[in-house]
């Protein structure tokens, strides 16, 4: 997971698809944000991902979004959760657990503001969760703002574990906001190569 090659803004795609327009009569009660580490926009046209492509057709997306630099994991996950680049949040390394540079702003928990904390401030009783494969995620999400967070156990041997966890949590708690963060296709990309048959097989698996 040394590179975070998502140039595709599908980590926020779920938010864009689930959320309704600001002037709509009703607003979304539940938002699920799904992130796939190492997913390059170049793969979308030839990838066998009918579910995702249908979501794209029905919602909003971009294939032009670039990674924050340097293009590695903690920096980019932080940038998405915090809505700011590394020059503001201060996370500058692949496995950053705390900012290498002083954050320009700190919330009440001593971390750069996140989408999770903003929702917590607005809705103190909201159920807010984050489920992930890569353990580094927990350092970037302001866990004090979360109702629940957990890592999928032994996920390389049990790739279905995170999906099972998310399904159980959604059915039981019906969270207002949930982030589900996959380590793949990045892990496969490092092992077998990006833009390889193995890489596209993993994308197809994740689409289902």
Residue ranges and their predicted role:
Residues 1-27:
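Bacterial Sec-dependent N-terminal signal peptides
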Residues 31-35, 62-66, 79-81, 118, ...:
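Structural recognition of the beta-strand scaffold that forms the well-ordered cores
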Residues 115, 162-167:
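Generic hydrophobic alpha-helical segments
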Residues 89-92, 107-158:
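Catalytic-site neighborhoods of secreted/periplasmic enzymes
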Residues 38-43, 66-67, 100-107, 117, ...:
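Second-shell loop/turn segments in exported
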């Amino acid at each position: 997971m040394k590179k975070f090659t998502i140039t595709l803004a599908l980590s926020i795609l779920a938010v864009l698809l689930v959320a309704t327009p600001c002037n709509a009569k009703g607003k979304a009660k539940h938002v699920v944000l799904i992130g796939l580490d190492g997913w390059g926009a170049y793969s979308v046209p030839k990838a066998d991902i009918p579910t995702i492509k249908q979501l794209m057709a029905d919602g909003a997306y971009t294939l032009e979004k670039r990674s924050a630099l340097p293009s590695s994991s903690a920096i980019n996950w932080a940038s998405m959760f915090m809505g700011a680049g590394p020059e503001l949040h201060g996370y500058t390394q692949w496995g950053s657990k705390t900012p290498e540079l002083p954050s320009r702003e700190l919330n009440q928990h001593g971390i750069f503001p996140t989408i999770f904390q903003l929702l917590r401030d607005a809705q103190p009783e909201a159920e807010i969760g984050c489920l992930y494969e890569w353990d580094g995620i927990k350092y970037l999400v302001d866990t004090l703002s979360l109702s629940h967070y957990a890592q999928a156990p032994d996920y390389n041997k049990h790739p279905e574990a995170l999906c099972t966890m998310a399904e159980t949590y959604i059915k039981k708690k019906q969270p207002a906001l949930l982030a589900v963060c996959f380590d793949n296709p990045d892990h496969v990309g490092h092992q077998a190569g990006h833009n390889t048959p193995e890489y596209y097989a993993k994308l197809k698996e994740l689409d289902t």
